[in-house]
């Protein structure tokens, strides 16, 4: 069940990376990018904790937030 939920959560991220991201300028302040971070977090920690980590990261990605190298814990 967790594998199916992870797959469902990853589909919109892959769609964003393939179809939307190429049409917009790079804007992520972190390395790896927020979408790559979300993929890694969901694959490493599962759908629940991975989604939590991804949302936290996306909320930190703004002009007044941090920047630089921020790997998945």
UniProtKB/Swiss-Prot annotation:
It is found in: Cell inner membrane. Keywords: Cell inner membrane, Cell membrane, Membrane. Its main location: membrane. Pfam families: YidD. Transmembrane segments: none annotated. It is a peripheral membrane protein. GO terms for cellular component: plasma membrane. SMART domains: Haemolytic (SM01234). HAMAP family: UPF0161_YidD. Could be involved in insertion of integral membrane proteins into the membrane. Belongs to the UPF0161 family. This is Putative membrane protein insertion efficiency factor. It comes from Bacteroides fragilis (strain ATCC 25285 / DSM 2151 / CCUG 4856 / JCM 11019 / LMG 10263 / NCTC 9343 / Onslow / VPI 2553 / EN-2). The lineage of its organism: Bacteria, Pseudomonadati, Bacteroidota, Bacteroidia, Bacteroidales.
